[in-house]
């Protein structure tokens, strides 16, 4: 059971046209495209947020060490 052949794809396309009508199909495709675009954008933003957290975690010990050094110099 591999990929559907051309006649099978045409039958599916005909059923979609009958169900939704020829005028609705571009709107459906546009909506799907927008949904995919928003999904990709959300994933990218999530990845960027994780990178910021990692960088922040790496920098915290340096800041704390510098603060302790300054504190010991003043004492």
Curated annotation (Swiss-Prot):
It holds the Pfam family TatA_B_E. It comes from the Bacteria. GO terms for cellular component: TAT protein transport complex. InterPro entries: TatA/B/E, TatA/E. The keyword Transport applies. Keywords: Cell inner membrane, Cell membrane, Membrane, Protein transport, Translocation, Transmembrane, Transmembrane helix, Transport. Gene3D superfamilies: 1.20.5.3310. Residues 53-75 have a biased composition (Basic and acidic residues). The chain crosses the membrane at residues 1-21. It is found in: Cell inner membrane. It is a single-pass membrane protein. GO terms for molecular function: protein transmembrane transporter activity. GO terms for biological process: protein transport by the Tat complex. Belongs to the TatA/E family. The Tat system comprises two distinct complexes: a TatABC complex, containing multiple copies of TatA, TatB and TatC subunits, and a separate TatA complex, containing only TatA subunits. Substrates initially bind to the TatABC complex, which probably triggers association of the separate TatA complex to form the active translocon. Part of the twin-arginine translocation (Tat) system that transports large folded proteins containing a characteristic twin-arginine motif in their signal peptide across membranes. TatA could form the protein-conducting channel of the Tat system. PANTHER family: SEC-INDEPENDENT PROTEIN TRANSLOCASE PROTEIN TATA. This is Sec-independent protein translocase protein TatA. It comes from Sulfurovum sp. (strain NBC37-1).
């Amino acid at each position: 059971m591999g990929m559907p052949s051309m006649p099978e794809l045409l039958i599916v396309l005909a059923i979609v046209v009958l169900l939704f009508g020829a005028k609705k199909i571009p709107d459906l495709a546009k909506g799907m495209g927008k949904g995919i675009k928003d999904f990709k954008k959300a994933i990218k933003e999530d990845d960027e947020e994780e990178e910021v957290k990692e960088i922040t975690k790496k920098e915290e010990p340096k800041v704390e060490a510098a603060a302790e050094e300054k504190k010991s110099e003043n004492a």
